[in-house]
């Protein structure tokens, strides 16, 4: 089956200067993929000419007359820009002309517009943002990263289902492990929502590891880390800040004097290998899970290489049949919940002693 990806060319800090070259580069390396470039035709065609790209049936342009700014409110984007490149790309997924949408645009606008256009899957209350982070053991998937600041225990359970299904769909892991991010491993730790979520996850039939702490994320203790969007976003931004600080300190030390500069040259192969392992561009592309279509949010400041990885993530999710697998797993969970509820109702009431 040929997979078609709709690319919001106008989104992100660099717009078509990054999205168009990144898409062309991806197409050249992946002959089984088709792409629809959505945005202002004149601008897109200008970028294609600059690349010397010749006409191909695998790439077509779909016009959209409006652009969602990176600082616009979700309400403005949703109500006032019905012909934005973001919304048109999502409509292509809704109509079946494309199997996935990739956008580097305004996160809030993409969340709101995606939910409005595509709707959530049956049994899913809220979509969640999932990202891949490097760990000592490889990588882990973390969700939610900011789509939902306030969550119920049931929402966290749904995040666990979606995260586990994402991993099993893409990486062929039959029962990926799930950790619930908490302030301690003990069952008594955490607020009422987290405690209840742990109970639901434990009874869900998923491979629930239990509570994990922040340091477990980068240890790679579990395949999936579940948390609400507030906690997840703070954890992610803190990690980014620590990485920037360490990089800054390292550069300062290597530039301190002639001897340290020489040491830096000697250590260059090791430093280069380290940078490749933690290169954030390889992990670009957050999955917006729980919708009736595949949506990938690229980082707004992504360069060409990073945006290419976001397209690749969208293709992997389509190939893995992620939407079908999530729907099936949620249906199973709903059935289990109904059976459990019926069983509890059938139990005789205890007489007071």
UniProtKB/Swiss-Prot annotation:
It comes from Nitrosospira multiformis (strain ATCC 25196 / NCIMB 11849 / C 71). GO terms for cellular component: cytoplasm. Homodimer. Probably interacts with PlsY. The gene is plsX. InterPro entries: FA_synthesis, Phospholipid_synth_PlsX-like. One of its GO terms (biological process) is fatty acid biosynthetic process. Pfam families: FA_synthesis. Belongs to the PlsX family. It catalyses: a fatty acyl-[ACP] + phosphate = an acyl phosphate + holo-[ACP]. Gene3D superfamilies: Isopropylmalate Dehydrogenase. Its main location: cytoplasm. It is found in: Cytoplasm. This is Phosphate acyltransferase. One of its GO terms (molecular function) is phosphate:acyl-[acyl carrier protein] acyltransferase activity. Keywords: Cytoplasm, Lipid biosynthesis, Lipid metabolism, Phospholipid biosynthesis, Phospholipid metabolism, Transferase. It is an enzyme of class 2 (transferase). Its EC number is 2.3.1.274. The keyword Chaperone does not apply. Pathway: Lipid metabolism; phospholipid metabolism. NCBIfam families: plsX. Catalyzes the reversible formation of acyl-phosphate (acyl-PO(4)) from acyl-[acyl-carrier-protein] (acyl-ACP). This enzyme utilizes acyl-ACP as fatty acyl donor, but not acyl-CoA.
């Amino acid at each position: 089956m040929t997979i078609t990806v709709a690319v919001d060319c106008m989104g992100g800090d660099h717009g078509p200067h990054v999205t168009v070259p990144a898409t062309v580069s991806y197409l050249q390396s992946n002959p089984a993929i088709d792409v629809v470039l959505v945005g202002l035709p004149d601008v897109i065609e200008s970028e294609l000419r600059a690349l010397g790209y010749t006409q191909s049936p695998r790439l077509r342009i779909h016009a959209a007359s409006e652009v969602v700014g990176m600082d616009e409110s979700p309400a403005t984007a949703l109500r006032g820009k019905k012909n934005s490149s973001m919304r048109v790309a999502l409509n292509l997924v809704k109509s079946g002309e494309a199997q996935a949408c990739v956008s580097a645009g305004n996160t809030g606008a993409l969340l709101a517009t995606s939910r409005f256009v595509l709707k959530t899957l049956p049994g899913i209350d809220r979509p969640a943002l999932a990202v891949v982070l490097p760990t000592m053991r490889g990588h882990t998937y973390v969700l939610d990263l900011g789509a939902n600041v306030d969550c119920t225990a049931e929402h966290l359970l749904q995040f666990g289902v979606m995260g586990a299904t994402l991993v099993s769909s893409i990486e062929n892991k039959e029962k990926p492990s799930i950790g619930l991010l908490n302030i301690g491993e003990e069952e008594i730790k955490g607020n009422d929502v987290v405690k209840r979520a742990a109970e639901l996850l434990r009874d869900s039939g998923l491979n629930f590891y239990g509570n994990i702490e922040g340091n477990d994320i980068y240890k790679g203790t579990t395949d999936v880390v579940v948390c609400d969007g507030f906690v997840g976003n703070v954890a992610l931004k803190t990690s980014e800040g620590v990485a920037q600080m360490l990089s800054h300190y390292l550069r300062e030390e290597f530039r301190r004097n002639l001897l340290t500069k020489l040491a830096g040259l000697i250590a260059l192969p090791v430093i280069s290998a380290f940078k490749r392992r933690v290169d954030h561009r390889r992990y670009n592309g957050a999955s917006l899970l729980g919708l009736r279509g595949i949506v990938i949010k690229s980082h707004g400041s992504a360069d060409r290489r990073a945006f290419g990885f976001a397209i690749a993530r969208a293709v992997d999710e389509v190939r893995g049949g992620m939407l079908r697998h999530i729907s099936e797993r949620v249906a199973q969970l709903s059935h289990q919940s109904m059976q459990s509820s019926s069983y509890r109702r059938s139990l005789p009431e205890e007489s007071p002693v």
